[in-house]
Structures are given as structure tokens and as C-alpha cells.
From Swiss-Prot:
Self-assembles to form functional amyloid fibrils called rodlets. Self-assembly into fibrillar rodlets occurs spontaneously at hydrophobic:hydrophilic interfaces and the rodlets further associate laterally to form amphipathic monolayers. Belongs to the fungal hydrophobin family. This is Hydrophobin-like protein rodD. Aerial growth, conidiation, and dispersal of filamentous fungi in the environment rely upon a capability of their secreting small amphipathic proteins called hydrophobins (HPBs) with low sequence identity. Class I can self-assemble into an outermost layer of rodlet bundles on aerial cell surfaces, conferring cellular hydrophobicity that supports fungal growth, development and dispersal; whereas Class II form highly ordered films at water-air interfaces through intermolecular interactions but contribute nothing to the rodlet structure. The gene is rodD. It comes from Aspergillus fumigatus (strain ATCC MYA-4609 / CBS 101355 / FGSC A1100 / Af293).
Length: 192
């Protein structure tokens, strides 16, 4: 996988709070601009560029089981973005299917990313594997914006289900390529 220059901070939050409340405060400022701002991170995604990379978040389970969720936002040209996507796989006949009949999700225009798994426990994903990549999740009248990486993180954290890890998670968000890595284990809903 190509290496990109990323800017990140390892600052941690000191107070516990409900992740769902924090993430739901994200603002869609217009149909072409997605803005998220909180005590943990700040991101401005314009129609062609995503600037500012997320801070590393330390997420702690109620039972003191710690996991780490690290999200990287990449602002890249179409050429660089496509270079980060795995080569097409014959096991994917169409988006939304599973690679080679397994548990890995086919995505990114019929390309097979063997590092992406679908969380079966979340309603919608089990019924429709392409749910995470195609669902529209509009707020404040911006329904034309597709589900953002923030919405995916929000659902991951508040689902309470048993998720497997996401690696090289990639999708288009507001015209820019977003590449992220999420590691989560079970039922996270608090940040320490």
C-alpha cells in the first residue's frame, strides 16, 4: 500500500462522555462542505479537499477493555487515491457482494478489498453488505451527502455489537478520497 504524508496528534481526552452525542453534533454546513468539530478532533472537508487529520482516539469499554480507533483522512488526487485501492478481484461481480463468497466486502466499484469486513450485528449490514458504502446519511437538509466516515464511526461506537476490524477502509466523501483505519472490538460507547 502506498505511503502518504499524514499529520496526527496522540492527544487523549481526559473526560468520559457519550460518543453518540459528540458525533451527532457534527455540522453539515452545505451540500458541498462537511465540517466536524469537537474536543477530540476537527475536520473540514470541502468539495475537492479534506484537510486536517484526526487525532488518535483512545476508546475505553465500560468493563475497562481498551481499544484504539485511529482514523486517517487523506486529501489526494484521483490518481493517488486509485493507487491506494486494491486491484480488481474476480470474486467480486458487483458492489455489495462478498469477496469470493466469504465475509469480506466488495466495494469501490467492484473492487475487492480483502481487508474490509462487515459487522453482521448491525441492522442493515447483514441484509445489505453495501449499506456502509451507499447509505445516505443526511443532516440538516444535506441528504445528498453520502454516509461519511464520521457516521460510520458513530455507528461502530454506539452499535453495541461485535465488530471485526476495518483496515484500509476507503470511500469517497464530498469528492475527496478518504482512507481510514478503524480497530474496534466490542460494544464501545465511551471515550476516556
Amino acid at each position: 500500500m502506498p505511503h502518504f504524508c499524514l499529520v496526527a496528534s496522540t492527544s487523549m481526552l481526559s473526560a468520559s462522555y457519550d460518543v453518540s452525542q459528540d458525533l451527532s453534533s457534527a455540522l453539515y454546513t452545505s451540500s458541498s462542505t462537511y465540517k466536524y468539530e469537537s474536543a477530540s478532533a476537527r475536520i473540514d472537508c470541502l468539495s475537492t479537499t479534506c484537510t486536517q487529520v484526526l487525532k488518535t482516539l483512545e476508546i475505553e469499554h465500560k468493563l475497562s477493555m481498551k481499544v484504539f480507533a485511529t482514523l486517517f483522512l487523506l486529501a489526494a488526487s484521483a490518481t493517488a487515491a486509485l493507487a491506494a485501492v486494491p486491484a480488481p478481484n474476480a470474486g467480486c461481480s458487483q458492489p455489495g457482494q462478498y469477496c469470493n463468497g466469504g465475509t469480506f466486502l466488495c466495494c469501490n466499484n467492484r473492487q475487492c478489498n480483502n481487508n474490509v469486513r462487515v459487522p453482521y450485528s448491525v441492522p442493515g449490514y447483514a441484509r445489505n453488505p453495501s449499506y456502509a458504502f451507499s447509505r445516505h446519511h443526511g443532516r440538516n437538509g444535506s441528504s445528498q451527502l453520502s454516509m461519511s466516515i464520521w457516521d460510520a464511526l458513530e455507528e461502530l461506537l454506539v452499535s453495541g455489537g461485535d465488530w471485526v476490524s476495518y483496515n484500509q477502509w476507503a470511500k469517497y466523501e464530498a469528492g475527496a478520497r478518504v482512507v481510514g483505519t478503524i480497530h474496534e472490538r466490542r460494544g464501545m460507547n465511551e471515550i476516556d
